[in-house]
């Protein structure tokens, strides 16, 4: 399982094998079969203080050597010894990069000695490794030698430990499938081809490069030759025009000699004028600077007076702010007191209004009583309608009771409906919350594994294509019950499985993977759940027995998953038997490992893997820190979601039932209302006749009672007014005190403001004076700056003119070949100069005219005739060089054709032989495979390569071997069968393959083993080392095989005490029982 983080290694009672006093028994048989060894095969390997060994000797057989042993016993140490002992690089092994790391821990030096078979006498190669300086000492046949000499001796025996076709260590098994076609071809040439095949290949690549260089040289020389011929044809006319041009050039030369003298005189006159202007400007500049200095002194004086005033103003402003704040506080207090007085007055006003209203109601009530008494005196006798009213009252009571019952029931139903509606909304919100959490998990999948997310979207749209159950990637369907436990699950389950789809049926899985990999070109993972469910598999022991050690649960109990997913995890990762511990567990980890003998243990922050040797009681454990969780931190309770959906359906049914019952109640209430209205109308007619007198009597009695009550509730306004006036007086006293403090602060503020105004006036006067002075300074500064700019310009012009005069004088002297220090025009030039123009314009005009005429004769010089003759000779030389290069190119092409024939024809035959054996091997496994020589361009020899194509299932097409398309087991099978295809063709003395059967299923592993035995134990085959930690039962073995069992540990019996007869007798007794 892939672990991206480093692991710490921790050993418990682990010891290496003890040094033996004599050679093992296998050495006798090995020496007896020495005649079967091929040239360069390994006869003996001796290791001293090397990796896990104190001292060990290995005597392999001449054919197939099966090196078998439990993990950690030292099988790969033998592979490392072969590589390093034969001058291999540490990079070949893919382990430590320093050779000193291969010495046993605690030792300062170690050694490896390898004896190689040779017909003229065996070769013994010894390498002693020093840890301190990470250096090695080499010996050949017990004599000191250099590493280069050892490498040469190994090369002579055709041993190539850096060739993956010959030497394939455990850490490099995966790199075989990553080799490019060109790399695989070169490795195959070195491994099984004749010695000259790889040399021919290298020559062809070199020849092709040189051929292209020669083609370019011939093309360039041909082009150059043609141009030279054309150019020389034009030179014939140039020779004739040469003398015509020479006359114009002489006149140009004389004009160019006079021109500098005219330029010098012009520049000298201009320089004199500029000097005068500059001196005048210098005097003006000095005057302006002297006039500006008094103004600057005055400005500094004003600034020194202004600074303390501004500081006082800042302090005054702060004090004014403090006084203002205090005034505001007192003002707010006065406002509060005013509001308090208003509240007291308002309360008193309310009492007065209430008393006036009471008096008014008393008068109104007395008037109503007199009116009612008068009406009662005027009434006559009324007929008795009591029986009819009582009958109506009885029916009305029944209706009222029924209405009350229906209303109560309706209220209960509405209450129930409101509760159900609220619960329904709560359930919907919770369900949406769970859906949002699932979207978060899907977003993590999309951002990390884009191909898997694309496949998920496709599956959701096409799920009906599959007959069995198909589960989405594990990270979506696994729900951790507590987010704090996600780190255990993500550490225990590989990321590749977390993003894998889980299928119930094999045919559904094949159909899905064909669609994803072949059609959509997506890199996805899939898993097939076990046929028999393992999800309910019980742990090996109850968790209660582990609680004394700090364990709280098994890993399976910390998350939920669908049946098929949980079944796979129990089967593959044994989550039902992996306990989770705490800090208490970590504190007693030694006892936990020793007493419980668990394979995998988790503490609060670490994971422990424990292995026990199959041959002793030794225990080896390794611990690593837990990975921070990335995918499962978002928890979704699946059971809660199911219950929510069920509760939503039940709530919907209850709402419908309540709505139906409420509709029936409304219908009954409507009927009762109609009957009630009819009865009340009848009763009203009867009651109006009977109860009018009684109503009048009751009204009079009621009004009289109300009148007495109002008369008793008299309000004492005088007491209330006295109490209110007392409260107002107390508040006013407090207001007077506050007002005094307010006026004091206000006066202080006013005084401070006045002081600030005085300071501001002083500051304004000084600032105005400073501004006026600064304005005057700016005006004078502007004029001064302009004067400085003008002076600088004039000084620069004067300097430039002076340099120009010197340059022109120097130039004129050089042109006229005058001696240094001479400033007058030579006498011999006066006559010639007198015939030429006197001004620059006239000289330039004549120069342009003469140059124009001379330019008509382009490409002419004094050596034009010599150039013509020289080019004629050059053309002859180029023709000869072109002929030589053309002949050389023809020879190269002939050599390339011969080398290609010598290389390509044997290579094609070799690849065809490999393909025949490779195809036969795959056919014997009921699969298909082929090997061919592939090249896009036959002339590009560095692009040739060997292409491997395989087909493991009948319903798929053949695919090229790549690191991504095939599974790890399929790549291992292909690698092994390709190496077996080279076995009989190989000219190398031995081949090493380390644990290549890891990841193979049992059927393929058995088939590959049979092929290895047949191929490696044949006639004229090289020595073969096959390292594996396990073997299947009932395998077919051959007499030519040598099985080397690797044991290790402190409880082992030393080899000098072995009794072979006792071993055999014990094995026979065991077989009989």
UniProtKB/Swiss-Prot annotation:
SUPFAM superfamilies from the UniProt entry: P-loop containing nucleoside triphosphate hydrolases
Predominant subcellular localization, coarse grouping: nucleus
Keyword Coiled coil: yes
Region (Flexible hinge): 435-635
Coiled-coil intervals: 264-340, 389-444, 641-723, 861-902
A Gene Ontology biological process term: regulation of apoptotic process involved in development
One annotated GO molecular function: ATP binding
Knockout consequences: Smc5 depletion in zebrafish embryos using CRISPR/Cas9-mediated genome editing or morpholino gene knockdown results in a significant reduction in head size and aberrant craniofacial patterning in the pharyngeal skeleton.
Protein family: Belongs to the SMC family. SMC5 subfamily.
Record protein name field: Structural maintenance of chromosomes protein 5
Protein's organism: Danio rerio (Zebrafish)
Phylogenetic lineage: Eukaryota, Metazoa, Chordata, Craniata, Vertebrata
């Amino acid at each position: 399982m892939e672990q991206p983080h480093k692991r710490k290694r921790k050993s418990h009672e682990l010891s290496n094998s003890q040094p033996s006093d004599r050679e093992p028994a296998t050495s006798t048989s090995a020496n007896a079969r020495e005649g079967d060894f091929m040239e360069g095969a390994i006869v003996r390997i001796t290791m001293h203080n090397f990796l896990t060994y104190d001292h060990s000797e290995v005597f392999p057989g001449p054919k197939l050597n099966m090196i078998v042993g439990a993990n950690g016993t030292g099988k790969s140490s033998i592979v490392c010894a072969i590589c390093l002992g034969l001058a291999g690089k540490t990079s070949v092994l893919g382990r430590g990069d320093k050779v000193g790391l291969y010495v046993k821990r605690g030792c300062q030096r170690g050694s490896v000695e390898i004896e190689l078979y040779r017909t003229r006498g065996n070769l013994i190669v010894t390498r002693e490794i020093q840890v301190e300086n990470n250096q090695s000492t080499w010996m050949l046949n017990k004599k000191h030698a250099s590493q280069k000499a050892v490498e040469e001796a190994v090369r002579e025996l055709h041993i190539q430990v850096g060739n993956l076709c010959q030497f394939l260590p455990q850490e490099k098994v995966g790199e075989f499938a990553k080799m490019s076609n060109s790399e695989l071809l070169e490795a195959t040439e070195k491994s099984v081809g004749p010695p000259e095949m790889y040399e021919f290949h290298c020559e062809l690549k070199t020849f092709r490069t040189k051929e292209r260089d020669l083609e370019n040289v011939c093309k360039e020389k041909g082009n150059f030759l043609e141009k030279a011929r054309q150019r020389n044809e034009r030179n014939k006319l140039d020779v004739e025009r040469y003398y015509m041009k020479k006359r114009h050039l002489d006149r140009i030369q004389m004009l160019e000699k006079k021109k500098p003298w005219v330029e010098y005189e012009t520049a000298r006159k201009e320089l004199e004028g500029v000097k005068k202007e500059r001196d005048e400007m210098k005097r003006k500049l000095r005057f302006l600077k002297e006039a500006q200095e008094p103004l600057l002194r005055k400005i500094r004086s004003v600034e020194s007076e202004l600074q303390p005033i501004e500081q006082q103003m800042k302090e005054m402003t702060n004090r004014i702010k403090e006084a203002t704040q205090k005034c505001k506080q007192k003002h707010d207090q006065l406002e509060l007191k005013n509001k308090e007085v208003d509240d007291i007055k308002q309360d008193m006003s309310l009492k007065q209004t209430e008393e006036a209203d009471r008096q008014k109601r008393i008068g109104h009530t007395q008037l109503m009583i007199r009116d009612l008494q008068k009406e009662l005196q005027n009434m006559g006798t009324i007929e008795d309608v009591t029986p009819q009213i009582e009958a109506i009252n009885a029916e009305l009571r029944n209706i009222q009771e029924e209405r009350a019952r229906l209303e109560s029931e309706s209220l209960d139903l509405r209450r129930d409906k409101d509760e159900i509606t609220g619960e329904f909304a709560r359930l919907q919100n919770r369900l949406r919350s769970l859906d949002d959490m699932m979207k978060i998990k899907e977003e993590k999948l999309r951002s990390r594994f884009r191909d898997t997310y694309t496949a998920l979207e496709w599956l959701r749209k096409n799920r009906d294509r599959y007959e069995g159950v198909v589960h989405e990637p594990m990270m979506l369907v696994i729900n951790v019950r507590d987010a704090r436990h996600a780190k255990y699950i993500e550490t225990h389950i590989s990321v590749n499985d977390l993003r894998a789809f889980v299928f119930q049926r094999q045919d559904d899985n094949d159909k899905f993977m064909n669609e994803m990999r072949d059609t959509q070109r997506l890199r996805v993972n899939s898993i097939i759940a076990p046929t028999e469910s393992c999800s309910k598999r019980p742990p090996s022991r109850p968790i209660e027995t582990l609680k004394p050690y700090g364990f709280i649960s098994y890993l399976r109990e910390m998350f939920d998953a669908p049946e098929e997913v949980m079944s796979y995890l129990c089967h593959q990762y044994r989550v039902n038997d992996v306990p989770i511990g705490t800090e208490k567990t970590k504190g007693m980890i030694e006892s936990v490992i020793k007493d419980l003998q668990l394979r995998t243990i988790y503490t609060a922050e670490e994971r422990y893997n424990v292995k026990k040797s199959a041959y002793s009681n030794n225990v080896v454990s390794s611990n690593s820190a837990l990975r921070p969780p990335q995918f499962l931190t978002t928890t979704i309770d699946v059971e809660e979601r199911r219950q929510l959906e069920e509760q939503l359906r039940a709530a919907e049914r209850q709402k419908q039932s309540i709505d139906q019952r409420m509709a029936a109640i409304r219908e009954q209430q409507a009927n009762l209302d109609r009957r009630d209205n009819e009865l009340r109308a009848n009763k009203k007619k009867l009651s109006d006749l009977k109860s009018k007198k009684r109503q009048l009597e009751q009204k009079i009695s009621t009004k009289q009672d109300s009148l007495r009550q109002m008369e008793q509730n008299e309000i004492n306004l005088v007491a209330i007014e006295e109490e209110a006036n007392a409260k107002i007086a107390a508040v006013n006293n407090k207001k007077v005190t506050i007002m005094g403090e307010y006026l004091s602060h206000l006066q202080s503020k006013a005084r401070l403001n006045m002081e600030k105004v005085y300071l501001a006036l002083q500051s304004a006067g000084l600032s105005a004076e400073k501004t006026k002075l600064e304005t005057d300074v700016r005006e004078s500064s502007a004029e001064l700056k302009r004067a400085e700019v003008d002076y600088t310009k004039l000084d620069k012009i004067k300097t430039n003119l002076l340099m120009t005069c010197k340059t022109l004088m120097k130039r004129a002297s050089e042109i006229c070949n005058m001696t240094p220090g001479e400033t007058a025009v030579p006498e011999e030039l006066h006559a010639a100069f007198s015939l030429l123009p006197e001004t620059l314009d006239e000289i330039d005009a004549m120069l342009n005219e003469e140059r124009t005429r001379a330019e008509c004769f382009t490409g002419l010089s004094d050596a034009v005739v010599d150039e013509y003759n020289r080019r004629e000779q050059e053309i002859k030389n180029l023709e000869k060089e072109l002929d030589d290069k053309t002949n050389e190119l023809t020879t190269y092409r002939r050599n390339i054709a011969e080398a290609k024939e010598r290389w390509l024809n044997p290579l094609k035959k070799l690849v065809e032989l490999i393909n025949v054996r490779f195809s036969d091997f795959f056919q014997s496994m009921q699969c298909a495979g082929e090997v061919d020589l592939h090249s896009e361009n036959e002339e590009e020899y560095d692009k040739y390569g060997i292409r491997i194509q395989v087909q493991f299932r009948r319903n798929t097409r053949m695919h090229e071997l790549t690191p991504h398309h095939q599974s790890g087991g399929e790549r291992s099978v292909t690698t092994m069968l390709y190496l077996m295809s080279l076995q009989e063709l190989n000219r190398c003395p031995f081949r090493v393959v380390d644990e290549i059967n890891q990841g193979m299923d049992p059927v393929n592993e058995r088939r590959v083993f049979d092929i290895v035995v047949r191929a490696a134990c044949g006639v004229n085959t090289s020595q073969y080392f096959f390292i594996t930690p396990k073997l299947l039962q009932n395998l077919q073995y051959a007499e030519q095989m040598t099985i080397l069992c690797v044991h290790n540990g402190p409880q082992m019996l030393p080899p000098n005490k072995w009794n072979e007869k006792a071993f055999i007798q014990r094995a026979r007794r065991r077989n009989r029982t």
